[in-house]
Every structure is written in C-alpha cells, then in structure tokens.
Amino acid sequence: LRKRSYAARFQWFEENADQFDDLYDKLVKLRHEIATTLGYKNFVELGYLRMGRSDYGPDEVSNFRKQIVDHVVPIVTRLLEQKKAILGLDHLYVYDGINFKEGDPKPKGSPEELVKGAQKMYHELSKETGEFFDIMVNEELMDLVNRDGKRPGGFCTSFPKYDRPYIFSNFNGTDHDITVLTHEAGHAFQYYSSRNQPLVSYLWPTMEAAEIHSMSMEFFTWPWMEQFFKEETDRFKYKHIAGSLSFLPYGACVDHFQHWVYENPEATPKDRKNKWLELESIYLPNRDYDDIEFPKSGGIWQGQLHIYQMPFYYIDYTLAQICAFQFWIKSEENREQAWSDYNRLCRAGGSLPFTGLVELAGLKLPFDDGCLESVVEKVSNWLDSVDVSSL
C-alpha cells in the first residue's frame, strides 16, 4: 500500500513532466534575464538579496552544506539502519516512511481539550506566553480544525493594524496537531513580542531567522508533552529529534541544486535531473526508489514547491534547525537563561539581520567551523541514549 501510494503520486508528475520542465525552464531563464539586466552575473546574488540576506552569502552557505555532508549524513545513515531494525525490514525504500510498527504517536483529546492543555502549558512556561496565548484564545485568533472546503496547510500571519498574529491549520488527529500549537505558536509569540518595534519591516525577521522562533518553541514546550501524548511521549520526542536531524541533508541538497541551476541557466531539463541524482548520491546516499521510475530518474525535486515559487528559500529551515537545537541544548543545561535569551530574540523581531539576531540570542552561527559538529554530536548522543526497543 505504501509503495502504491507513493507511485500514484509520482505517476501524476510523470504524466505532466513536460509541462513542469517547460515551466521551470522558463522561470530559470526569466530570473537569469532579470538578474543580468540589473547588472548581476546570474540570479544567485539577486536571489540572496531578495531573501534579505545582507550579512552572508553563497560561500558561507556552501561551507554549511559541507559540514552537513561531513557530520550529519553519517548519523542519518545510522538512524536509517536503526529504523530498519525497528520496523523489522530487510531493506528500506523511500516509501517506508513510517517510524514505528505500532504507528506514530497521537495526541490524546479533542481539539478543544488540546487548546485548553496548550493554554495551561503556556501559562506555566512563562508570564509572557500565558498572556499571549490568552489573547489568541479569547480573541479567536486561531482557526485550527479541518473542515470541508478549507484550504490545506498551516501557517502564521498577522494583522499589523491590530498588533495581532493569527494561526491557521488543519488538525487531523496526528502529532502534527501539537506541532501547530508549538511551532506556529512560536511564530505568533515572536510577532506578539516584537509588536512595538518602530518600523513595520521590523515586525518580522528574514525567513531563516523566523524559523528559529518556531522550531525552538517546539523544544521549549517539551516538558509538557506528556499531557498531550501520555504513554507515547518518549516516542514523540524520539521522532521529533530524529526527524529534525534527518531533514538536514535533504534541505542542503535542495539548496545545492538551486545554486547549480542558477549558475547554469542554459542547462536542459535532462541536465537538471542528472545533477539532482548526483547531489542525491552525496546528501541522501541511502535513498532507494525501488522501480518507481520518475523519482528514480531524478525528477523528485519537482514535487518541492519552493524550488519553483521561492528560489533559495529552503536552506533557511536547516540554519534555523541548528539554532533551535542550540536552544534545546541550552535549556537542558540552564532553562532560565535559555528562555531569557529566546525572549530577547523574539522582542528584537526583524531589527537585525540573521547573524545579528543569532549573536543577540547568544547562539553560535551555523556557518562557523565547528558549530554544526558540536551541536549534532549532542543531538546524536541523546538519540543513542534512547532504548528504541521500548518505544
């Protein structure tokens, strides 16, 4: 069933492959033309400027990607071997996305009970988060439950005129429901905290900095996960950490691919698919698509909307994840100091560029040599300490 579902998805992509190739080819060439008309060598530099990356460039990101290959890919390979044992499989294919034989953890309670539990959690976390979440509940600033005709997805937006954030999602009875109440609430809390910044452009930071608040809130709320997951709490935490770490190589692969694409705007669709397969062998060496032809031939990236719609917006998630891991590590050592640093970061909004915000929060820059290695070593040690047979 897993294989048939995965194959059915990419059957649609295969049937429309020529249209996707043509569309992306036009986008790449148009973006290249815009960049060269403005005096840039190619779209890479312009793409960075459009993302507001005024304090780092492709060289720093390239170094970061290299660290992921050196220090994260081997750990993910080990986690996949462990997953194979957990599931009792002789071989893992890309469609073997389940994490536990018994299924993934599920939150206990109705949507109303989950929100009530979150309200209690945020009051216990801090005075500021308690006040913030009361406003979200009392002013009905969250549309959380799935219903017929509702658009998919989840996000946080804002109403600057009223100094209020807004959370949208589709609860579906999975652990993702709790992630909404932590991840999107992290975005919303940052906006609430920075609402008094003097400029509208300072209310939100750039994309990679914005994800620090959301991903870090996922970890700051860990002490309360038992009230949502009961006996499945350890399973939830393991999935959370392992999944966050395992995402890093894919995120880096998408970024590396986009750099190559815009540095080689005359490449053909076939060239791009071959390049994806080459990069996949570096960042995701354990992927096996079985006999599903479209992803096997290098087309899987066409299912990633960011690549079409928001060029260079993807490495942001990986940079923020390393910062969030640092907050998790700090909170395990000195929770009060970690929360103080996080609060200071949220209040700053977008008044500083990414590197300035990271330094303000007392974190190490993910680009810097040694940062990623030291962070993932602690994450790996935590994963190694878990008795996965008991999950």
Go through the PLM ranges and name each one.
Residues H176-E184:
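Short alpha-helical catalytic segment bearing the HExxH-like zincin motif
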Residues L1-Y6:
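Short, charge-rich amphipathic alpha-helices with coiled-coil/heptad character
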Residues F10-Y166, K364:
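Contiguous, non-catalytic segments that form substrate-binding/exosite surfaces or channel walls
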Residues G186-V200, F220:
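Catalytic Zn2+-binding segment of zinc metalloproteases
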Residues K161, F171-N172:
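Extracellular zinc-dependent metalloprotease catalytic-domain scaffold
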Residues V145, L181, F189, S216-F219, ...:
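C-terminal, non-catalytic "cap/extension" segments appended to globular domains
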